[in-house]
Amino acid sequence: MFRTLMNAKIHRARVTEANLDYVGSITIDEDILDAVGMVANEKVQIVNNNNGARFETYIIPGERGSGVFCLNGAAARLVQKGDIIIVISYALVPEEKIAMHRPKVAIMDENNRIAQLIAEEPAHTIL
């Protein structure tokens, strides 16, 4: 049996743009993607801390070092520039490998730079 587990998370990123006229997706700084192991076209869940919206889209790599987090297409209706979001990717992990699975979590600062990179979330973390 396989279980769906969190594979990577970008925590508390700040939306830099919302582009309604684009076809779809979320554009994310490629340096940040590399740090957590997310890739182009990967399906991700977006959680908006400001309004509680949760939705799925896919990744488009953005300019390295830019700190860009741009929601495109219909998803642009669910965020505003400056909103705090969480970007989560998941993986299907075989039951026998669950104990070895270590997701990567990037905790972002207010300028969309990685403040901390951790291999697992401690219980009762408040940021």
Curated annotation (Swiss-Prot):
Q: Which UniProt keywords apply?
A: Autocatalytic cleavage, Cytoplasm, Decarboxylase, Lyase, Pantothenate biosynthesis, Pyruvate, Schiff base, Zymogen
Instruction: Spell out the subcellular localization from the entry.
Output: Cytoplasm
Q: Give the modified residues of type Pyruvic acid (Ser).
A: S25
Report the active site residues.
S25, Y58
Please report a single Pfam family linked to this protein: Asp_decarbox
Write out the GO MF terms.
aspartate 1-decarboxylase activity
Q: Does the keyword Cytoplasm apply?
A: yes
Q: In which pathway does it act?
A: Cofactor biosynthesis; (R)-pantothenate biosynthesis; beta-alanine from L-aspartate: step 1/1
Q: Which NCBIfam families match?
A: panD
**What quaternary arrangement does the UniProt entry report?**
Heterooctamer of four alpha and four beta subunits.
Q: What is this protein called?
A: Aspartate 1-decarboxylase
Q: Which organism is it from?
A: Geobacillus thermodenitrificans (strain NG80-2)
